[in-house]
Amino acid sequence: PSLFREQNNPKQAMVIPITSSERRNYIPMDFVPHTTIVNHSLLLIPDCPLYIFALLNSQVHNAWMRVVAGRFGTDYRYSSNVVYNNFSFPELTETQKQKLHELGQNILDVRAKYPDSNLATLYDPNTMPLPLRKAHQKLDKEVAKIYNKNWDLDNESEIVSDLMQMYQQLLTTDNKNIETTETEDEEIEDEETTEDDETTEHTDNKNIETTEHTDNKN
């Protein structure tokens, strides 16, 4: 979630179209240079690493998007809060990050072989080049492997069901952390209150002793 920032001119950013045709298997995401002015129809992740680009371009993330995203007519409406923030990103080793980096770069390299085709054409199911489709399928298999799931990639309901369980586990963990923090805060407050009471009592005792001593003198 922290990757999303409001910047008009980052050094380099990955852009995600807010609306995308329901006919596409993958939302066409891309990188843009700092000279590009991004308008309100795009979300951007400044200085996005290629392994994040790869994860977001995987079928796993797109399956999640198809279930939780809003709609604009029949098109999907991507949201950083609903789709991105609630997606269960896997914990990655450096080796896995490097592998995803390579697969993400492979997708960009294959796209570059079709300079006369824009992303709309490249990601139209009827015109998507076979090498690009294979590059995505290779990425999809690697991402499923990283999640340590024996998913049937033709069955997105199975993928989403597991992602929903991961999401619920994250919520449970977050709630436990919140409860633990609140309990610790209450304990600190109780300790401070006890110390204040002891200080007050000690002061009162001194005052009483002083008063008694004065009375005895009199």
Residue ranges and their predicted role:
Residues 205, 210:
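Functional cleft and adjacent loop/helix regions within the main domain
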Residues 1-198, 217-218:
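S-adenosyl-L-methionine
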